[in-house]
Curated annotation (Swiss-Prot):
Family matches, as SUPFAM superfamilies: Zn-binding ribosomal proteins
Protein name from the UniProt record: Large ribosomal subunit protein bL32
BP GO annotations: translation
Entry keyword Ribonucleoprotein: yes
Family as reported in the entry's similarity comment: Belongs to the bacterial ribosomal protein bL32 family.
GO molecular function terms noted in the UniProt entry: structural constituent of ribosome
Protein's organism: Borrelia turicatae (strain 91E135)
Length: 60
């Protein structure tokens, strides 16, 4: 049976476990054109704008 040759250091163990402790990035941000919540880095589904440029023609 395989046995570790050296004891893993605290730094290595904690670095490996730290992936589960990362903070969640907010998935939504306010649209700069209409103020509606929109998914980050995507066109707003309400107005069709992204970064102050219109990308979709929405017939409202």
């Amino acid at each position: 049976m395989a046995v570790p040759k050296f004891k893993p250091s605290k730094s290595r163990s904690r670095t490996r476990r730290s992936i589960n402790m990362r903070k969640k990035i907010p998935q939504f941000q306010e649209c700069s054109n209409c103020g509606n919540l929109a998914v980050r880095h995507r066109v707003c589904v309400k107005c069709g704008y992204y970064r102050n440029s219109q990308y979709l023609e929405l017939g409202l």
